[in-house]
Amino acid sequence: MINRQHIQLSLQSLSLVAGFMVWVLISSLISQITLDIHLSKGEISLVTAIPVILGSLLRIPLGYLTNRFGARLMFMVSFILLLFPVFWISIADSLFDLIAGGFFLGIGGAVFSIGVTSLPKYYPKEKHGVVNGIYGAGNIGTAVTTFAAPVIAQAVGWKSTVQMYLILLAVFALLHVLFGDRHEKKVKVSVKTQIKAVYRNHVLWFLSLFYFITFGAFVAFTIYLPNFLVEHFGLNPADAGLRTAGFIAVSTLLRPAGGFLADKMSPLRILMFVFAGLTLSGIILSFSPTIGLYTFGSLTVAVCSGIGNGTVFKLVPFYFSKQAGIANGIVSAMGGLGGFFPPLILASVFQATGQYAIGFMALSEVALASFVLVIWMYWQERMKTHTERNSQSIN
């Protein structure tokens, strides 16, 4: 059983790395792509954000299907399907090609819900936070592509760079054929029954909001920073890619730390600090005329989003152990959608005002609202615990 645990944790975590590497292909190479395909600023924002749509919405059925058929089959099918949009993008010569191919790249982001549904089955509840945190560190795949793809593209061209990812996908599909767990525990409760059990629970929607902000901030900065740093601060694509990779690395490496801390202390207390930090970072980014101050604000977002992501996914199986697949899918879908809207909002704000301050202040205000909600949830839990203890004392 121990070997089975470690094999699945390693294989599924590496699979998430591969999926996220593919997911951010367009945003990582957009500076080189626009040399061949002319795009307006609005079209660039749309093209870089479009993979997030399917990458978010597909997480709900993938979470459910993982519970029903197992991670082995779902990872295999996902990697095989990804071969088609990756090849399409490698021969793209129009805005339509980038939008159509980019939409189906979203499968790479959707695979997240496979592991967070599958892996807790192999471990006791007190380890769910750190296990999901380790798996979530597969986000580092976005850093790998963001840093490496522009460098490789300078040497061989962006189309050849994209084609290299076909090999990566084929390798991981084969790894799941060989080492995927054929005997994973399956849950065959109907999707209708699972949805009925969770959708009226306000905790599900609070967790969805929290992940909308923490993971949404991570995704939004990942897809927006490479082009933003080039356009706004005049950096070259390789330098912008390196800085974005640094942001991703900090956030990703702190995700397991968030899960570990949530296993050891109150997850809601941790989220208080997370949202307080995001509130502060939004204010800093709103008034960042220099690259130094902007870097500090971005790294604050990286720290808070990483710890917050790990903490939220400690809470999902804690509250919804019997409906983990559908609950994981809904919460992670909301997180993905949180990465879709900010780039479009920032682009619209910039076109209307010539600056990004209002867009970053919106991050601060939403984070502040979540901070208040977490405090409310924390005191509700305290009151519930106090009431239960009093009733036990009376009995």
UniProtKB/Swiss-Prot annotation:
<protein>
    <recommendedName>
        <fullName>Nitrite extrusion protein</fullName>
    </recommendedName>
</protein>
<keyword id="KW-0472">Membrane</keyword>
<comment type="similarity">
    <text>Belongs to the major facilitator superfamily. Nitrate/nitrite porter (TC 2.A.1.8) family.</text>
</comment>
<dbReference type="InterPro" id="IPR020846">
    <property type="entry name" value="MFS_dom"/>
</dbReference>
<keyword id="KW-0813">Transport</keyword>
<feature type="transmembrane region" description="Helical">
    <location>
        <begin position="330"/>
        <end position="350"/>
    </location>
</feature>
<feature type="transmembrane region" description="Helical">
    <location>
        <begin position="357"/>
        <end position="377"/>
    </location>
</feature>
<keyword id="KW-0812">Transmembrane</keyword>
<dbReference type="Pfam" id="PF07690">
    <property type="entry name" value="MFS_1"/>
</dbReference>
<feature type="transmembrane region" description="Helical">
    <location>
        <begin position="133"/>
        <end position="153"/>
    </location>
</feature>
<dbReference type="InterPro" id="IPR011701">
    <property type="entry name" value="MFS"/>
</dbReference>
<keyword id="KW-1003">Cell membrane</keyword>
<dbReference type="GO" id="GO:0015112">
    <property type="term" value="F:nitrate transmembrane transporter activity"/>
</dbReference>
<feature type="transmembrane region" description="Helical">
    <location>
        <begin position="44"/>
        <end position="64"/>
    </location>
</feature>
<keyword id="KW-0534">Nitrate assimilation</keyword>
<feature type="transmembrane region" description="Helical">
    <location>
        <begin position="96"/>
        <end position="116"/>
    </location>
</feature>
<dbReference type="InterPro" id="IPR036259">
    <property type="entry name" value="MFS_trans_sf"/>
</dbReference>
<dbReference type="GO" id="GO:0005886">
    <property type="term" value="C:plasma membrane"/>
</dbReference>
<keyword id="KW-1133">Transmembrane helix</keyword>
<feature type="transmembrane region" description="Helical">
    <location>
        <begin position="15"/>
        <end position="35"/>
    </location>
</feature>
<feature type="transmembrane region" description="Helical">
    <location>
        <begin position="203"/>
        <end position="223"/>
    </location>
</feature>
<feature type="transmembrane region" description="Helical">
    <location>
        <begin position="240"/>
        <end position="262"/>
    </location>
</feature>
<comment type="function">
    <text>Involved in excretion of nitrite produced by the dissimilatory reduction of nitrate.</text>
</comment>
<dbReference type="InterPro" id="IPR044772">
    <property type="entry name" value="NO3_transporter"/>
</dbReference>
<feature type="transmembrane region" description="Helical">
    <location>
        <begin position="73"/>
        <end position="93"/>
    </location>
</feature>
<feature type="transmembrane region" description="Helical">
    <location>
        <begin position="160"/>
        <end position="180"/>
    </location>
</feature>
<dbReference type="GO" id="GO:0042128">
    <property type="term" value="P:nitrate assimilation"/>
</dbReference>
<feature type="transmembrane region" description="Helical">
    <location>
        <begin position="293"/>
        <end position="313"/>
    </location>
</feature>
<feature type="transmembrane region" description="Helical">
    <location>
        <begin position="271"/>
        <end position="291"/>
    </location>
</feature>
